[in-house]
Amino acid sequence: MSILEKIQEKQPLILNLANFVTPQRVADAISFAGGSPLMTAEISESETLVEIADAVVVNIGTISEKDYPLFLTICQLANQKHKPLILDPVAVNVPFRANFVKRLMQEVKFDIIRGNSAEIAWFADKESLNKGIDALESNLEVEHARVAAQKTGAVIIQTGKVDVISNGFEELFVETDSPLFKINVGCGDMLSAIVGTFAAVSDDLFKAAYEATEFFGESGVKATEQVENLPGNFVNRFLDKIYQATQEVI
């Protein structure tokens, strides 16, 4: 049974600490893929929600210092309860965010980290230019992904024109990029959510990370072909393609 088939059978619950820019898109991505999205911003319900969740996805896109106790508690509980823990380290090389993530990593282990080349370079202690959340570098930086995986112990998904998935010893590549991913804010957040959904039903997180990234990219390419040069129509068509793929395996 494929991972996508397992998602349709289990309908995993994905707990998200989402940013306040793209929560609807994140929830839609999980739901259209066959999972069940759940968001929280309340620390008092952390244990209950992590207990019932099948995976946890945390996104630092709009963090403030007051969020740290919630993030720490949720992440620690995910580790304690052996729930896959996925980090989306938005603009992590900005000092406040870097400090926030460093503090978290002293206390918890992330199972999968999904970011662009500049964000992944930070985990590898390498230099990489960035602009906001979009990496300027276009070269494939396989070494950064591998070193980041070795340093963090996480499976790394480095997204770009060619996506690199590394466990520190082996790399897999996905070459299904769409220019409309970059234009539509939140596509990276959606990918992290899809990764969490795949990880929730798989014992092999490296395989889950690869298959989620491939599934996401293929759906994006198909959607791009249909919207032509109308990027405002992309996300809706993209979600349609995700849903159609799930129906083909039922």
Curated annotation (Swiss-Prot):
Gene3D superfamilies: 3.40.1190.20. The keyword Nucleus does not apply. Its EC number is 2.7.1.50. Keywords: ATP-binding, Kinase, Magnesium, Metal-binding, Nucleotide-binding, Thiamine biosynthesis, Transferase. InterPro entries: Hyethyz_kinase (IPR000417), Ribokinase-like (IPR029056). It is an enzyme of class 2 (transferase). ATP binds at residues 114, 159. One of its GO terms (biological process) is thiamine diphosphate biosynthetic process. Pfam families: HK. Coiled coil: none annotated. HAMAP family: Thz_kinase. Belongs to the Thz kinase family. This is Hydroxyethylthiazole kinase.
